[in-house]
Amino acid sequence: MTDVTIKTLAAERQTSVERLVQQFADAGIRKSADDSVSAQEKQTLIDHLNQKNSGPDKLTLQRKTRSTLNIPGTGGKSKSVQIEVRKKRTFVKRDPQEAERLAAEEQAQREAEEQARREAEESAKREAQQKAEREAAEQAKREAAEQAKREAAEKDKVSNQQDDMTKNAQAEKARREQEAAELKRKAEEEAHRKLEEEARRVAEEARRMAEENKWTDNAEPTEDSSDYHVTTSQHARQAEDESDREVEGGRGRGRNAKAARPKKGNKHAESKADREEARAAVRGGKGGKRKGSSLQQGFQKPAQAVNRDVVIGETITVGELANKMAVKGSQVIKAMMKLGAMATINQVIDQETAQLVAEEMGHKVILRRENELEEAVMSDRDTGAAAEPRAPVVTIMGHVDHGKTSLLDYIRSTKVASGEAGGITQHIGAYHVETENGMITFLDTPGHAAFTSMRARGAQATDIVVLVVAADDGVMPQTIEAIQHAKAAQVPVVVAVNKIDKPEADPDRVKNELSQYGILPEEWGGESQFVHVSAKAGTGIDELLDAILLQAEVLELKAVRKGMASGAVIESFLDKGRGPVATVLVREGTLHKGDIVLCGFEYGRVRAMRNELGQEVLEAGPSIPVEILGLSGVPAAGDEVTVVRDEKKAREVALYRQGKFREVKLARQQKSKLENMFANMTEGEVHEVNIVLKADVQGSVEAISDSLLKLSTDEVKVKIIGSGVGGITETDATLAAASNAILVGFNVRADASARKVIEAESLDLRYYSVIYNLIDEVKAAMSGMLSPELKQQIIGLAEVRDVFKSPKFGAIAGCMVTEGVVKRHNPIRVLRDNVVIYEGELESLRRFKDDVNEVRNGMECGIGVKNYNDVRTGDVIEVFEIIEIQRTIA
């Protein structure tokens, strides 16, 4: 796993560097801001924090109460309704100091509420008593005045009216009692209303204080800070308790309080929903509207979007990016569609796309380099020694059979071409030779067009290109390719005009043809040296070596000889007895036996080194090609080889490269492009030739795969189901049987178990040693899958001289055959003024009232056209036939 620094980890955890250093110190790990953190130290910190915060922070209790409620319906029938009441209560473990502070605040709040309630009640009682006393005094005055009037009137009235006066006095007394009761009720309602207003004011103040405390607590987030939702639920419960006290205090007074009291015998009287309704009725007032909801939650939507620091690696899935931004995956997909990219939630996207999406959604992006370990391993190498002159690396290029390998054989005084099938070099050979003037390293590249990638790889590793051109053949297509590769690599070219001893040799023609491609000889004012050689007779070989060494002296080639080596893989293959074998060309430093090497996706310790002659060597300096053993797998040709110090880190880098390659490959495959849409629509109509390919070396596998894939057309595609280096195994045969594929072996053979599977499944197994035959046979197989081309061929013309009527066939054209032959039941066209007016079938063909099958040129006949009666004199009837032409792959 890649180590990160304290600063990077702090940015990811969104905390300060000082706090993170303090947390590491609490866990027993001393770190500074620039120190790196390993995976084990991360785990130690996490365990420490978990132990510190051990114990459940929340305890949630749930209760369900089920009952049945009978509701009267229409027609005197009652309906039973199942009611389920769910109660949920969460207990939160608080810090002791925080709990004491909250308890003190709650106690102070309760005391303030109780004091306010008592003061309000006393004030209401005093006001009601004073008002009652004032009204009683006024009533006494009125009664005294009325009594005086009655006494004066009684003196003037007769005694028989005393009974009526007694009745009036009783009625007046009842009216006074009623007025006193009404005044008392109004006083109680006024006191109750003031009490409710005071309670609401205190509750609102408590809510405001709770909201301020919440924002104060969230201002400095820490590791053990309480959850926002927990704090909100606490204050919500406090508000509910206050409202409950309001309802309890208001019971028995007023209509609203009576309405809020539950009925006797109701099973659900004490449910939370009923209490919520009662509180809503109290808050709403008389005839008021409910403002609260029994299911209202305490969460408030943020007023503005939260901008986050999003850490993005080199690849990330859409779902992971959405989680880092705390948004839904659908929002990320919508943002990508606005940017012109379509993706699914599990699709892997690259770093650039993820950065665009995150910045488009308003977040700050932190790009994390995942190859920090690889860079650290590569930089930890002792390559500071002084540079020394080194031998040139020469690549021999040219067309097929122009004499490249023969020229190199003569230089090395060995015969390697006899081991090459058909005299054609099948894979790269690397050799170094000692001359009187110095050492030269040669790379022999194949000349066939299929080995373009191998030849390009040779040009990347070379210093000088020797372009071999046959004097009797001139410039050929592969010669032009070699020139293009040399120019692309900016490598100087030395031209070797071979086969100069042949009588038909024409070196001037070679110079003229090469001058058209920018290769000018020195005598013409150019920069390229032309040497006339003969690989058979040995003519001009010394001059060619002198020209190479002269060019190398001009280039001033130097390399560091001491220190850890680096180079490139020229070729690799899997040997049955030795395992993975790689041919390595050392560029700098010295490669020793026992060194730890990192090579692309593979790594290992060099167990053995051999030179091109098969001899064991202990070290190899710059420009020396060697075969090394001990790698974990077969590397790809062209991979960089680097000597590192630590085998464990080399393994980590190799595994990281493998995972990175898979991720990038998957991202590339899943990326949906508009230009692929129509290709996907017609995918079901394409025939496929499935091939399982095995070859002796990795370079041949690459070259053959590229050549076969280039043969694909819109109708027939070549699909490489599997490929590899080594013999054909039982697994390869099983794969070919499952996928209905052709087994192709290039310079390899099938083992005994594979042959049994091949015979049992009747598989198509083919062996090749020359790539020409392989490509030609695959072309033939693909040509057989092509649908034939249909071509119309005109076989005869007949001119209409007269038209007759027939009760059986309708209009019969009396014709004269002017060209070719007219055959019965062939398709025809009717031409009028050289314009096709009808296309159909010849139904009837007669000559002298006899049915005939054909009529030749210069003869008269009667022609009946099927389902067509508009034949006129002067028309031309064109008879043709449809022939099938077998198509081939070009």
Swiss-Prot record:
PROSITE patterns: G_TR_2, IF2. This is Translation initiation factor IF-2. Residues 398-405 are annotated as: G1. GO terms for molecular function: GTP binding; GTPase activity; guanosine tetraphosphate binding; translation initiation factor activity. Residues 423-427 are annotated as: G2. It comes from Shigella sonnei (strain Ss046). Residues 45-304 are annotated as: Disordered. GTP binds at residues 398-405, 444-448, 498-501.
